[in-house]
């Protein structure tokens, strides 16, 4: 299952806006933001869980968490799975924005189960499973309260078989 890890919170105020950053040397000290699966899957599973975990610590309860692409696809899943029992998280909504449907965060179910700590319940065709693999983006789309794309044109394109990347 998912291991306990240090989550640092860095904050900065700029032009009257408070920014928070998730810190973890193990996951975020590499030379590039994207590497290769399954390393990226583990890193972004950590990030998704960390985002939710820090909210009560910093005393910020958002109305909406806006997720972008597969890298944050587990935020709506984790919110549904392990955070809804906590009153703090009840009623928080999620929006999943798709920038590029080609990149979905796909890997075998066993590895993703080990990385995420999610139960068998989540690995079904109507949830994270797609063509017998686990799919972070699909999970985010299934569990998000709303789905958006970067444009109306892109929204129409990805509804077609060619651009639907097997999620049509």
Residues covered by each model-derived region:
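Catalytic cores of nucleotide-sugar-dependent glycosyltransferases that transfer UDP/GDP/TDP-activated
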Residues: 1-168
